[in-house]
Every structure is written in structure tokens, then in C-alpha cells.
Design a protein with these regions (language model features):
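C-terminal ends and interior cores of transmembrane alpha-helices
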Residues: 91-106, 335-348
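Extracytoplasmic gate region of multi-pass secondary transporters
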Residues: 37-41, 230-304
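Intracellular juxtamembrane helix-capping segments at the cytosolic ends
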Residues: 125-139, 364-379
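Helix-to-loop junctions at the C-terminal end of transmembrane segments
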Residues: 69-82, 312-325, 407-408
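Glycine-rich segments within core transmembrane alpha-helices of 12-TM secondary carriers
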Residues: 142-170, 387-399
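Extracytoplasmic
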Residues: 18-48, 254-262
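Central cavity-lining transmembrane alpha-helices of secondary-active solute carriers
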Residues: 57-75, 304-316, 395
């Protein structure tokens, strides 16, 4: 067997491995909190009797934080470093989570949105610092693989969040008062705040090496990044930012509207229990577990499977990326996701439900690949490119309300034309738009 290369050894050496594991754990946190926030959409609809478009403002409040705080976070990283920025981001999230207590007590929609915005600010700072840190913490050629693995933990957090929401936040609105429904968020967010506080202290006292290679990092093929030029002159970076805009928007939009969509397609606990009962044996045990669950909780489980698909896809994708170029794989997954949404539009019942759930799998490798393709060849402009791309996460504040407004006007299924457009652009970027290029300054 050939000896491992220096790059491979560096990837698995203790000097990289322990920090990588530590920071990767943070990906679980912002994945969990981001998806838990999406559970507030059906929750707020129940409390305040909101149309889809207004309920989607919870997503807008969260992702607007990326527009406001992504660039300032880049400057904060330059001032205090990656580690301290991560700690600050966790403490900001603690404050945001605790703000849900007065919001629930007063049953105030503006306070709910404010709490969501503050949590979003903390997650923005964590994402902006953790993503490039993982990308540069090891050999340049394996940056997409490394970030895809880290994003797998993000997906795990996302897969667990709907289960927590279904069990402790989402309720049968016909059996509780508005105040009682609002109050269900208090305990979960208090516990999350306590966990984030402990994690922030743990990271503060951990040993994360100071990384000073940000300006010279060139993932993939080396380009001609020139310090002082405008980041807008790099076409592949600008298109990559647009790709992130569409990716985050469509992923968040589908997940946010998922509970309501699955209910319109006839999901109910009795049908699910009957299916497992017909399997006998282990199926009967599952039936006993599902029996007391409400229809809303079953729909939340399906949303959890949507995120679990992303987890499976990222674990599998980290291996596929060693065989297939990241741009090509991104294009294939983009077209496949568009096909799944189209199938869900054209059908009803179980086919419509499961084709949408499968979109989670095809979403899996999009973020890490768009991100690494977007900053490829930037050289000393890498930090600016990263800031631009992370700012584009604001797509999560734009696409979901548009999807909600379309759903109010033409119905949820007909509104799915918007996600199809988003996925087709992502496919275009992977196959044709991601080649590193710089226009004349």
C-alpha cells in the first residue's frame, strides 16, 4: 500500500482532527436551531390565525439577520479571531432563546419575531465563522469533502429538531387557548439557552488553533485572486452567492410549508398506524408508538425525514465527491430535486408527500459545494467572497414569504413552480456557472 500523502496525513493528524471535531459539533447546533425555528411557522399560524405569507415572516426575521450581520461578522473575525467569534455567536443565541419567554408570556407576534431575529444573528455569526474555518482546516483539495461531512452534523440537528417541535411545541390548536399554545415554546427554549451557554463556555476554554491562512486559501484549482479588486468582478462568486440565495430559500421554504402541505395531502395518524399494523411484528410496536400521536405530529415527523434525507445525502455525498467532480454532482442533484418537486405538483397523496420528502436528500450536498465552488481561486479575496456568499443566505428571508404568498393565492402545489426555478438555477451553476472567472475591474 502506498504511503499516505502529506495532504492526506494532514487531514487526519491530531493537529487537525480535534479542532475539526470540535467545530463540526457546532454545525449540529445551528442546524438544530435553524430548523426548530421553522416549526414556528405552523405554531404562529395557530396562535395568531395568520395566512401563510404572514406566518413565513418568522423565516424572514431569522434569515434577514444574515443580510445585517454576515459582513460585520467577517470584520469581527479579523479583529478577535475565529474562536472568540464562535463563542460570541453562541452567547447571542442564548439571549435570543431567552427572549421567547416574554414573547410567549405576552402572546406578542412582534416579540416572537424579535426573538427569532436575535437567534438568527447568533446563528449568522456562527455560520460565517465556522464554515470558512472548516474549509481551511486541512488540505485544500479536500475542502468540499470536509465541509460536506461537517454539514452532515448540521443535517442531524435539523432531523432531530422537528421531532422536538412535534413533541413539545406543535399542539392540537383546537384543545388549547391561544395563550396556552404560545406558552409551549417557553420550556424548550429555556433548556436550549442553558445548553448553548454551557457549549459557549466549553468552546471558550477549548484549544482551537489560530488559522491565519484565510487570505491565501485557494480550494480546488488556483485562480488569480488579487487583493484590492472588487469581489463583484468574480462571476463565479457572484453566481455562487445567487446559488446560495436560491438554495437556502427553497430548502427553508419547503420545510416551513411542509407540515401544512402534508396535512392537505391526507396525512393522519390512523392511516400511518394502519400501515405499520399490516406489517406485523416490529410494525405492531411502531403502531403502539404512533397511536397517541396527532396528525400535526405525524406531519412534523415527515419534515424530520426531509432533514434526515439531507443527513444521509451528505454522508453519502462525502464519499461520492471523491469520485465525481463537485460541480457535476451539484448539477445532477439540482435537476433531480426539480424533478421531485414537479412530481409532487403533478400527484396527490403518498406520492406527492414522499417525492417532496426526497428533496431533502438532493438538497444535501448543495450548500458545501456551492460554497467551495464560489470561493475557488479567490486567493487573498477569499474572506470577502465568503462574506458575500454568507450574506446571500438572506434568501431564506425572501423565498419562503414568496412561496407563502403564492400558496395563499394559487394553492400550495401550484406554488411549487418557484422551488423548481430555484433548483434549475442551482443545476445550471454546478454544470456551467461555477468555473472561476474574473471580469475586468
Amino acid at each position: 500500500m502506498a504511503a499516505p500523502s502529506k495532504q492526506t496525513a494532514a487531514l487526519t493528524s491530531p493537529g487537525y482532527l480535534v479542532p475539526f471535531i470540535t467545530v463540526t459539533a457546532l454545525f449540529f447546533i445551528f442546524g438544530f436551531i435553524t430548523i426548530l425555528n421553522m416549526a414556528l411557522v405552523p405554531h404562529l399560524r395557530s396562535i395568531f390565525d395568520l395566512p401563510y405569507a404572514w406566518a413565513m415572516l418568522a423565516e424572514s426575521a431569522f434569515f434577514l439577520a444574515y443580510l445585517v450581520f454576515a459582513s460585520p461578522t467577517s470584520r469581527l473575525i479579523e479583529a478577535i479571531g475565529y474562536k472568540r467569534t464562535m463563542v460570541v455567536s453562541l452567547f447571542i443565541q442564548v439571549v435570543g432563546c431567552l427572549m421567547f419567554v416574554p414573547a410567549a408570556k405576552l402572546v406578542s407576534f412582534p416579540l416572537f419575531l424579535t426573538a427569532v431575529f436575535v437567534v438568527g444573528a447568533g446563528v449568522t455569526a456562527l455560520q460565517t465563522s465556522a464554515n470558512p474555518y472548516v474549509s481551511i482546516l486541512g488540505p485544500e483539495h479536500s475542502a468540499p469533502v470536509r465541509l460536506t461531512l461537517a454539514q452532515a452534523l448540521n443535517s442531524l440537528g435539523g432531523a432531530i429538531a422537528p421531532l422536538i417541535a412535534g413533541a413539545y411545541i406543535l399542539t392540537d390548536s383546537t384543545k388549547l387557548t391561544k395563550a396556552a399554545i404560545a406558552d409551549t415554546v417557553r420550556l424548550p427554549y429555556i433548556l436550549i439557552a442553558a445548553g448553548l451557554l454551557l457549549l459557549g463556555l466549553a468552546v471558550a476554554f477549548s484549544h482551537l488553533p489560530a488559522v491565519t491562512r484565510t487570505e491565501s486559501f485557494r480550494p480546488g484549482k488556483e485562480g488569480d485572486g488579487v487583493l484590492g479588486t472588487s469581489i463583484w468582478s468574480y462571476k463565479h462568486t457572484v453566481l455562487g452567492a445567487l446559488g446560495i440565495f436560491f438554495y437556502v430559500g427553497v430548502e427553508v421554504g419547503l420545510a416551513s410549508i411542509g407540515v401544512n402541505y402534508f396535512l392537505t395531502q391526507g396525512v393522519n395518524s390512523a392511516k400511518v398506524a394502519s400501515f405499520f399494523e399490516s406489517l406485523g411484528g416490529f410494525g405492531a410496536l411502531v403502531t403502539r408508538w404512533l397511536g397517541p400521536w396527532t396528525n400535526v405530529e405525524i406531519a412534523a415527523i415527515l419534515v424530520s425525514l426531509y432533514w434526515f434525507g439531507a443527513l444521509v445525502g451528505r454522508l453519502l455525498g462525502s464519499w461520492i465527491l471523491t469520485k465525481v467532480k463537485s460541480g457535476k454532482l451539484l448539477g445532477i442533484f439540482g435537476f433531480a430535486a426539480a424533478a421531485m418537486v414537479l412530481l409532487s405538483m403533478a400527484t396527490t397523496g403518498q406520492v406527492a408527500i414522499w417525492s417532496l420528502v426526497l428533496c431533502g436528500f438532493f438538497n444535501s450536498i448543495m450548500f458545501p459545494n456551492i460554497f467551495t465552488l464560489g470561493i475557488a481561486g479567490l486567493g487573498p479575496m477569499t474572506s470577502k467572497g465568503s462574506g458575500l456568499i454568507m450574506t446571500a443566505v438572506v434568501g431564506g428571508a425572501v423565498i419562503p414569504p414568496l412561496l407563502g404568498a403564492l400558496a395563499d393565492k394559487v394553492g400550495i402545489q401550484n406554488a411549487f413552480v418557484l422551488p423548481i426555478v430555484c433548483y434549475l438555477f442551482i443545476a445550471y451553476y454546478g454544470l456551467w456557472g461555477s468555473k472561476p472567472t474574473r471580469t475586468a475591474a
